[in-house]
Amino acid sequence: MSDLEAFRSEIRAWLEANCPPEMRQPANDEGDVCWGGRNFQFKNEAQRQWLEVCAAKGYTVPDWPMEYGGAGMSAAQAKIWREENARIGARPPLSSFGIWMLGPALLKFGTEEQKRHYLGEIARGEIRWCQGYSEPGSGSDLVSLQTYGDDKGDHWLVNGQKIWTSYADKADWIFCLVRTDKANKYQGISFLLFDMASPGVSTKPILLISGNSPFCETFFDNVAVPKSQLVGELNRGWDVAKYLLGHEREMISGAGGGDRTAAIGPAMARNGIHDPLLRAELAAFDVDALAYSAMGEKFLDEVKVGKGHPAQSNMMKYVGTELNKRRHELFMAAGGSRALEWESESTGGGATPRTWLRTKANSIEGGTSEVMLNVIAKRILELPGA
């Protein structure tokens, strides 16, 4: 037996012994997702137990170094961990912008003190983070942002507004792009971390067409941010932001992969499955989702050894977005007119149509599909500009 085969056997046995049965079922609503944080309310004891046993082993961030709360797995071992979790249908023990976005940025740009302070909290699910990038007048043209940090010696005094801040009303801390030099558009932005409980921080939820409010407006009114909470170099926050955006797009693109039966299974139980055209669409989706998952694994392997194309995350984001939208279009097609019911048992109390509506935003968040296609054309296909 090879070392990797032995490792797979070890992980398989550990999962069988430690993953509660309740955590081996698909997440049906927001309460089934463990976000962690100071004020997070566990849905049940199984959810709490699953986070605690995984955090104790470093399995919430398996490929992070052990000294920062991870398990120190190699790329091959982390792939086995993901495969074995998928095999039993295990839910992620922790979902976190800290894991998906801030953590990788801190590992690359953070000071040793920042890594030791923040990464362990992220890995254990003790702090919930949100991202402060977009502003009312700065979306696709992010470098035009106006939130300003006035240098006061040992701290910055931050004033401004962010928008589309996911779960800002529930987050403990925010990683934020702040202008610290008004004279230079690109080299005048810094990447700051600050506590959402700081005086002067306020949030206002934004109601979406789906009926939910996962996004917020976030306001900063004379918020004091210590100089020790600067990540990377002063006025070079755009370097950190570009690196982090790649991880954000990987996160959003992940919605297109996952369990391929997530679209096919529900459709099989509905009358629409008898439609031969729908059956053909389901088969095509299954093939494309499998190809996408394989592409994602290849990309992760390349990133781990420093060979990933800088623009590949744009491609993953675009394809993942389109797949996720297709997935939910198939839900609706299979359900027929009844799938539009907002309050019925067959649609999970309206979860099916609400989620279908929510997926329309996938084409905008994290960079619009049009912007992604432009980047792919220029940086991967090397097509000439207009």
How should each PLM-predicted stretch be described?
Residues 25-28, 273-279, 290-346:
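C-terminal helix-coil-helix/basic helical segment that borders enzyme active sites and/or dimer interfaces
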Residues 163-168, 209-210, 361-366:
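Glycine-rich phosphate/pyrophosphate-binding beta-alpha loops
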Residues 76, 80-81, 101, 240-254, ...:
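Glycine-rich phosphate/cofactor-binding loops in nucleotide/flavin-utilizing enzymes
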Residues 1-96, 117-124, 266, 276-283, ...:
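Amphipathic, small/basic residue-rich leader segments at the start of a protein or domain
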Residues 94-113, 139:
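N-terminal glycine-rich flavin-associated loop
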Residues 146, 154-155, 159-202:
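A short core secondary-structure module
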Residues 200-294, 362:
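Glycine-rich beta->alpha junctions and the first turn(s) of the following alpha-helix
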Residues 125-133:
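A short, Trp-centered hydrophobic/proline-enriched beta-strand micro-motif
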